[in-house]
């Protein structure tokens, strides 16, 4: 900064000296003597110096040094001493600017690298336009102009440096509403340029900071909404909140198939998100009939899980009603099919036995079916007779065996008389004509009827 102050002091001294030279007052055309070959040169020099002084007063107003008033000086001889003084002053100014440029080159590059190139281009275009407007147009002269030192390169370099410093000062006074800006890189020593990686990183951070500040001034929130549960980086835009954490929408993925779960439903298992397909395929119970995952309603029976539409009778395929189901070898059956297939059968009607039954003759019987197989009469007193595996009443039992009295038709339980291929009670074996008992055992037979000897002789003798 000391070199800059010295440069400004020398510039002000040179400008004051040029101002004291003054500009020649314009005279009426008729009183002027014919100008020398270079008569237009002092007017051009004074115009340039006045224009340059005005521009510099405008550009370097931040120095806040008073300007000496312009004294009214007499007309100077054309381009005699003023050109020499101006040339010496400009040479001195060029030398000082070269020294300043060599000293502050790295600082200028570092400051300029922190601003977009569009600002520099716009600033240079505005400076060129302002210089074009401030400098008066000089008509072309038929006489060749003498060569003299030019201040264009030196003043442009100084203007660019001052514009960079002004932008840097404005950058330091940004409003506090935005995020804190990264600190400016410290100036490096001459001959040791900063690494390109640090310069590009600083420029990128500065541009991001300016963008966030602009968005904050426009009312757009740029504060981080937490760290992403996947990449562990701050979230500034859209956010997905799930499982007690925040996620970038593109990072909230299914743990099975890596499908984005931003706006769809998901399931959680051990702290990890899953899409419905992966969750059901991996963790849902399987149906005992079709072996497919169960997604909605489920029936639990026989130690396994079932789809409601698949929990049905394995025989007829009908769903179970209010009567429930019966199980056989781990398979469910409806009541009708279970009894039809596995219930004990009645020996009389061959139907399934549901409730009470009678066990007799090595078989099971419905109480209503255990009757005499000939007359279908129930057994009185609970006693029955068996003949060839069939339950019979006493009469039909003796009838089947031939043990009924041929006279009275009642069973012969005690002593009996066997004659004519039949059995008789002893009291009922009598003569057919006189009805006398044939106790002595002698009788005559005629047409399968017994007769005593006298009656037989009497009737058929």
UniProtKB/Swiss-Prot annotation:
InterPro entries for this protein: Paxillin_TGFB1I1_LIM_dom1, PDZ-LIM_domain, Tgfb1i1/Leupaxin/TGFB1I1, Znf_LIM
Q: How is it modified after translation?
A: Phosphorylated by gonadotropin-releasing hormone-activated SRC.
Short sequence motif LD motif 1: positions: 3-15
Q: Name one GO cellular component term.
A: focal adhesion
Q: Which PROSITE patterns match?
A: LIM_DOMAIN_1, LIM_DOMAIN_2
| Entry superkingdom | Eukaryota
Q: Where is this region: Interaction with PTK2B/PYK2?
A: 1-240
Main subcellular localization, coarse class? other
Function field = Functions as a molecular adapter coordinating multiple protein-protein interactions at the focal adhesion complex and in the nucleus. Links various intracellular signaling modules to plasma membrane receptors and regulates the Wnt and TGFB signaling pathways. May also regulate SLC6A3 and SLC6A4 targeting to the plasma membrane hence regulating their activity. In the nucleus, functions as a nuclear receptor coactivator regulating glucocorticoid, androgen, mineralocorticoid and progesterone receptor transcriptional activity.
Q: What is this protein called?
A: Transforming growth factor beta-1-induced transcript 1 protein
- Which species is listed as the source? Mus musculus (Mouse)
């Amino acid at each position: 900064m000391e070199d800059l102050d010295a440069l400004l002091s020398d510039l002000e001294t040179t400008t004051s000296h040029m101002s004291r030279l003054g500009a020649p007052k314009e005279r009426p055309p008729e009183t002027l003597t014919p100008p020398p070959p270079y008569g237009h040169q002092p007017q051009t020099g004074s115009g340039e110096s006045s224009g340059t002084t005005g521009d510099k007063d405008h550009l370097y107003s931040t120095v806040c040094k008073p300007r000496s008033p312009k004294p009214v000086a007499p007309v100077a001889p054309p381009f005699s001493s003023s050109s020499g003084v101006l040339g010496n002053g400009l040479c001195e100014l060029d030398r000082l600017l070269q020294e300043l440029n060599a000293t502050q080159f790295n600082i200028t590059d570092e400051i300029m690298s922190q601003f977009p190139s569009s600002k520099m281009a716009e600033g240079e275009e505005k400076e060129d336009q302002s210089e074009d407007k401030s400098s008066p147009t000089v008509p072309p002269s038929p006489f060749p102009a003498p060569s003299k030192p030019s201040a264009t390169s030196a003043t442009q370099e100084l203007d660019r440096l001052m514009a960079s410093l002004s932008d840097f000062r404005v950058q330091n006074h940004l409003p506090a509403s935005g995020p804190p800006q990264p600190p400016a890189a410290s100036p490096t020593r001459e001959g040791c340029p900063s690494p390109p990686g640090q310069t590009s990183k600083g420029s990128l951070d500065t541009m991001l900071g300016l963008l966030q500040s602009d968005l904050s001034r426009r009312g757009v929130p740029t504060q981080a909404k937490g760290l992403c549960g996947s990449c562990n980086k701050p979230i500034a835009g859209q956010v997905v909140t799930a499982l007690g954490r925040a996620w970038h929408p593109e990072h909230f993925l299914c743990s099975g198939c890596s499908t984005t779960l931003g706006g769809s439903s998901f399931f959680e298992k051990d702290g990890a998100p899953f899409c419905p397909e992966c969750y059901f395929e991996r963790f849902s119970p399987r149906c005992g009939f079709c072996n497919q995952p169960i997604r909605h309603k489920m029936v639990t029976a026989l130690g396994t899980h079932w789809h409601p539409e698949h929990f049905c009778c394995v025989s007829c395929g009908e769903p179970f009603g209010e009567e429930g189901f019966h199980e056989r070898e781990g398979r469910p059956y409806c009541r009708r099919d279970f009894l039809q297939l596995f219930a004990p059968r009645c020996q009389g009607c061959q139907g399934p036995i549901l409730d009470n039954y009678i066990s007799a003759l090595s078989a099971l019987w419905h109480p209503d079916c255990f009757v005499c197989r000939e007359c279908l009469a129930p057994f009185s007193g609970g006693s029955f007779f068996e003949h060839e595996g069939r339950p019979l009443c006493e009469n039909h039992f003796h009838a089947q065996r031939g043990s009924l009295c041929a006279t009275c038709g009642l069973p012969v339980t005690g002593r009996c008389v066997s004659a004519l291929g039949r059995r008789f009670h002893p009291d009922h074996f009598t003569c057919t004509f006189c009805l006398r008992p044939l106790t002595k055992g002698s009788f005559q037979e005629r047409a399968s009827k017994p007769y005593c000897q006298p009656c037989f002789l009497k009737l058929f003798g």
